[in-house]
């Protein structure tokens, strides 16, 4: 169990931090990043 705790508390690497904060190669790719607002409005208001 001690090893599990140590694994969970390991600090992030610089590359991981840059990716999360939007530095380096850019932001994380997500569905909402790829789509525009009109698509989401249609999906949530169509019913």
Swiss-Prot record:
The modification 2,3-didehydrobutyrine is found at residues 30, 39. It holds the Pfam family L_biotic_typeA. There is a cross-link at residues 32-46 (Lanthionine (Ser-Cys)). Maturation of lantibiotics involves the enzymatic conversion of Thr, and Ser into dehydrated AA and the formation of thioether bonds with cysteine. This is followed by membrane translocation and cleavage of the modified precursor. GO terms for cellular component: extracellular region. One of its GO terms (biological process) is defense response to Gram-positive bacterium. InterPro entries: Lantibiotic_typ-A_Lactobact (IPR007682). There is a cross-link at residues 30-35, 45-47 (Beta-methyllanthionine (Thr-Cys)). The keyword Signal applies. Keywords: Antibiotic, Antimicrobial, Bacteriocin, Lantibiotic, Secreted, Signal, Thioether bond. It comes from the Bacteria. Induction: By trypsin. GO terms for molecular function: signaling receptor binding. Lanthionine-containing peptide antibiotic (lantibiotic) active on Gram-positive bacteria. The bactericidal activity of lantibiotics is based on depolarization of energized bacterial cytoplasmic membranes, initiated by the formation of aqueous transmembrane pores. Ruminococcin A is a broad spectrum bacteriocin exhibiting activity against a wide range of pathogenic clostridia and B.longum. This is Ruminococcin-A. It comes from Mediterraneibacter gnavus (Ruminococcus gnavus). The gene is rumA1.
